[in-house]
């Protein structure tokens, strides 16, 4: 009995990973307190980014996507494209429509639509997880206008980044479908198989506004925090005379905007473009946290999403490396 209690206490003890995470959090807190002026300035930059880019490019689409799913209009309008895409990825027309919206409008539109469809009983949990995994890419506006035209001063490169993001997302969806077919299918919640119908209700619009506001503000909070963290860490790297490549790699790991901006300033342009492609595929911890906040409410696993992101990172980098 004593030995069993000892083993239980040992199992319940502090794990090495918990210690590392605690030290990392304390380091980040100390860093922001020591360079509060820098942290404040980068927080302002993050808020400006939200006001000038995130809110205009995200909030209207969030409202419309909520309405498209709630009314059933999205599935009806996108049906001609959803059928072949659904066969390719092994998804229903409902989930395929969510993926299309995600590829057109960028994250988290597709993920939000997939989760709403699962919540309403139109899809099962496994299908929702795969739809979330292959629909979360940066928007065309961000890649073409911000990364291509602003950071690289080359809109064509922005278009190439967007195409590579779509292709890598589809590749990850195909591979996840292949993995699913190899495994034994688990019992899933029954889904609705009735044809898509369009239904409008007076309550749908205020509900869509409320949900879109909540999710958009949450995303802005993540963008602001990671912009502050990434900028403050970048100042430390500069004071230590660290390599610009190291700074660009770390920025790409944390947040896509700062990562692609830092990559564009690297002297080796071929490597810089490949790193930009990888940053687009990975999308940054900031986006992953945003996806976690969306999925956690419905107990959706992020494992397929993270696997897909690793595939997309490699695929985007490879496509850019081959074509540029």
Describe these PLM feature segments:
Residues 83-95, 99, 185-204, 251-252:
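Juxtamembrane inter-helical linkers in multi-pass membrane proteins
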Residues 319-324:
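Juxtamembrane boundary at the C-terminal end of a transmembrane helix
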Residues 73, 205-280:
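Transmembrane helical segments that form the transport core of multi-pass membrane transport proteins
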Residues 88-152, 250-267, 271-295:
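Alpha-helical membrane segments and immediately flanking helix-loop junctions
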Residues 117-179, 293-318:
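Membrane-core helix-loop-helix motifs of multi-pass transport proteins
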Residues 49, 98-103, 128-136, 157-169, ...:
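Alpha-helical transmembrane segments of multi-pass membrane proteins, especially transporters
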Residues 23-38, 43-55, 59-63, 67, ...:
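Selected transmembrane alpha-helices and immediately adjacent juxtamembrane segments
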Residues 9-23:
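N-terminal membrane topogenic signal
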């Amino acid at each position: 009995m004593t030995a069993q209690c000892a083993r239980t206490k040992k199992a319940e003890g502090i794990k090495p990973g918990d210690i590392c995470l605690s030290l990392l959090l304390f380091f980040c807190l100390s860093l922001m307190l020591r360079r509060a002026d820098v942290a404040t300035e980068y927080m302002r930059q993050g808020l400006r980014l939200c006001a000038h880019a995130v809110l205009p490019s995200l909030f209207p689409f969030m409202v419309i996507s909520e309405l498209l799913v709630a009314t059933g209009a999205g599935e009806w309008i996108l049906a001609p494209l959803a059928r072949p895409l659904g066969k390719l990825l092994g998804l229903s027309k409902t989930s395929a429509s969510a993926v299309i919206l995600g590829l057109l409008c960028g994250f988290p539109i597709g993920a939000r639509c997939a989760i709403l469809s699962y919540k309403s009983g139109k899809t099962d949990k496994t299908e929702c997880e795969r739809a979330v995994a292959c629909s979360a890419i940066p928007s065309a506006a961000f890649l073409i206008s911000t990364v291509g035209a602003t950071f690289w001063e080359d809109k064509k490169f922005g278009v190439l980044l967007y195409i590579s993001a779509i292709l890598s997302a589809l590749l990850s969806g195909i591979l996840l479908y292949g993995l699913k077919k190899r495994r034994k299918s688990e019992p899933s919640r029954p889904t609705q198989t009735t044809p898509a119908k369009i239904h409008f209700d007076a309550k749908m619009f205020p509900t869509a506004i409320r949900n879109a506001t909540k999710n958009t503000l949450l995303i802005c909070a993540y963008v602001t925090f990671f912009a502050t963290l990434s900028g403050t860490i970048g100042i430390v790297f500069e004071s230590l005379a660290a390599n610009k490549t190291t700074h660009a790699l770390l920025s790409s790991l944390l947040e896509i905007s700062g990562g692609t901006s830092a990559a564009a300033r690297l002297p080796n342009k071929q490597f810089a473009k490949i790193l930009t492609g990888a940053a687009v595929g990975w999308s940054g911890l900031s986006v992953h946290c945003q996806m976690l906040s969306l999925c956690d409410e419905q107990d959706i696993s992020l494992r397929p999403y993270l696997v897909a992101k690793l595939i997309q990172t490699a695929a985007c980098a490879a496509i850019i490396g081959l074509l540029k």
